[in-house]
Amino acid sequence: DGGLMNNLPVEPLEPVCEDIIGVNVNPVTEAKGFSSFRNYADRVMHLALRANIQHNIQKCDIYIEPPGLMDYNLFKISAAKQIFDIGYAHTLNLVEQIKRDLF
């Protein structure tokens, strides 16, 4: 996790890894009405993060963006366990495909 400046940091891995698997848990949601400043700020952050990682997505041999994460916003730290569980379950479903793609 590269935080705000480089949220999908593949550069440290390129010289030492044969294959790179990137995972994004901050998908861009559809624009809906902004009922609060928090909703607006969340949308702006997601758009900024997407623009920030776009170049590095192309460098990933496997790119995973688990579905179902659009219901969570960046400011809901209390949902970290649920977000982890969604990503873990989705990735387990991809294990055979990843093996075929990489080996």
Which residue ranges define each predicted feature?
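Patatin-like phospholipase
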Residues: 2-103
